[in-house]
Design a protein with these regions (language model features):
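Juxtamembrane helix-capping/reentrant segments at transmembrane boundaries
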Residues: 16-29, 83-95
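Alpha-helical transmembrane segments
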Residues: 1-7, 37-68, 89, 101-135, ...
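N-terminal alpha-helical transmembrane segments of multi-pass membrane transport
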Residues: 1-21, 25
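P-loop potassium selectivity filter motif centered on the GYG triad
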Residues: 147-175
Length: 263
């Protein structure tokens, strides 16, 4: 129904012919149809996800923030009749601003932690235990603690955990602070790069949503495994408490993109 309304209002895509096969099929596609995708993501998330989860909160803010940038871009193209849409520098400023919000939130939030195994000598800092039969290496009870950390994982490498505090090693007592600064900068780069990557991918009808659905499915698996202590330990993946809730968001995202492809 929303698609029909947009088509009646002639809010459609104008295509510059580049001679690509299937390119002209995108002509007339409702330009502001992204509003439907946003609703299809946000409504299920609000209904089924834990809204007190910091990762869900960040995803809701990111979805609305980037959706607003896309809305302004389409509005300028369609109603202001400026073919270029929102100027590139304003898009980048918006993306960098979002990256800064995400990075700083991950830094200051007490709910953003990783869980590590500890030795018996560190038993004083233990916050939880993994019962016998749940750990693949020793099949014994394992002591763990939740810590604030700048560690990340590097794919395809053995012993692949990397600590951004390494960049601050020369600064002595300020190594951890430098590590968080590097972490926030990298977060900004990732948010900006992924956002622009989606823009660059878009062009043929369904191309961006099709690839996004595949990427979303992969990230959903990783989020589930990383948020499950048993699977994370078995697969030697960093366990991040509460990150499994992201599966709800990703399921809504995949459903929205597949629904878009259907119509």
């Amino acid at each position: 129904r929303i698609i029909r309304i947009l088509q009646k209002q002639q809010v459609g895509e104008e295509i510059r012919d580049l001679g690509l096969e299937g390119q002209m099929q995108k002509k007339g596609t409702p330009t502001m149809g992204g509003v439907i995708i946003l609703l299809a993501i946000l409504v299920p998330v609000v209904l089924f996800a834990r809204l007190d989860n910091v990762y869900i909160q960040l995803m809701i803010v990111s979805t609305i923030w980037l959706g607003l940038i896309g809305f302004l871009d389409d509005y300028i193209k369609v109603f202001r009749k400026h073919k270029e849409g929102l100027k590139g520098r304003f898009k980048v400023i918006g993306q960098v601003g979002l990256g800064l919000i995400v990075g700083v939130t991950l830094y200051v939030s007490d709910d953003v932690l990783i869980r590590e195994k500890v030795s018996i000598s560190e038993v004083g800092v233990v916050t939880s235990t993994v019962d016998e039969g749940f750990v693949s290496e020793t099949n014994q009870t394992v002591l763990t603690k939740d810590i604030k950390s700048t560690k990340t994982t590097i794919p395809f490498f053995k012993n692949n955990e990397f600590d951004y505090a390494w960049f601050g090693a020369l600064f002595g007592d300020y190594a951890e602070e430098i590590g968080w600064i590097v972490f926030i900068i990298i977060t900004i780069v990732i948010v900006t790069a992924v956002s622009n990557g989606a823009n660059l991918t878009d062009g043929l009808d369904g191309l961006a949503t099709g690839t996004s659905a595949i990427v979303g499915a992969t990230l959903g698996i990783l989020a589930y495994v990383s948020g499950n202590m048993v699977y994370a330990d078995y697969l030697n993946i960093m366990y991040i408490p509460h990150s499994g809730e992201l599966v709800v968001f990703i399921a809504a995202f995949i459903g929205a993109t597949i629904g878009f492809l259907w119509y």
